[in-house]
């Protein structure tokens, strides 16, 4: 009988702590989009691997970018959905 190896996930690290030149800023929606699902939800830190401090800052900056219309609040609608309206 063969024993299965336990799955050990790859160690996650905070991208912002590892690279100090990568700022968390609402003016950079290209970076912030990596931390948002296709539905527009902010991805949890246990999935992204960011530290608690950077996750709080990231959440705040995403909310600022949404208020300034640099990011969507929800997912973009497809053309088929808009035709039905």
Swiss-Prot record:
**Which GO molecular function entries does the Swiss-Prot or TrEMBL record give?**
small ribosomal subunit rRNA binding; structural constituent of ribosome
- Does the keyword section mention rRNA-binding? yes
Q: Which InterPro entries match?
A: Ribosomal_bS18 (IPR001648), Ribosomal_bS18_CS (IPR018275), Ribosomal_bS18_sf (IPR036870)
Its Gene Ontology cellular component terms are: cytosolic small ribosomal subunit
| Keyword terms, alphabetized | Ribonucleoprotein, Ribosomal protein, RNA-binding, rRNA-binding
Q: Name one Pfam family in it.
A: Ribosomal_S18
Single GO biological process annotation from the record:
translation
Q: Which domain of life is it from?
A: Bacteria
Q: Which Gene3D superfamilies match?
A: Ribosomal protein S18
What is its biological role?
Binds as a heterodimer with protein bS6 to the central domain of the 16S rRNA, where it helps stabilize the platform of the 30S subunit.
Q: So what family is this one in?
A: Belongs to the bacterial ribosomal protein bS18 family.
The protein's assembly and partners:
Part of the 30S ribosomal subunit. Forms a tight heterodimer with protein bS6.
HAMAP family xref list = Ribosomal_bS18
| Official protein name in the record | Small ribosomal subunit protein bS18
Q: What organism does the record attribute this protein to?
A: Solidesulfovibrio magneticus (strain ATCC 700980 / DSM 13731 / RS-1)
């Amino acid at each position: 009988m063969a024993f299965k190896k336990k799955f050990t996930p790859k160690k996650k690290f905070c991208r912002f702590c590892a690279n100090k030149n990568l700022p968390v800023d609402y003016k950079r929606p290209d970076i912030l989009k990596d931390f948002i699902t296709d539905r527009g939800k902010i991805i949890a830190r246990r999935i992204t691997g960011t530290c608690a401090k950077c996750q709080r800052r990231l959440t705040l900056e995403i909310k600022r970018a949404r208020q300034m219309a640099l990011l969507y609040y929800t997912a973009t609608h497809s053309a088929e959905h808009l035709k039905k309206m």
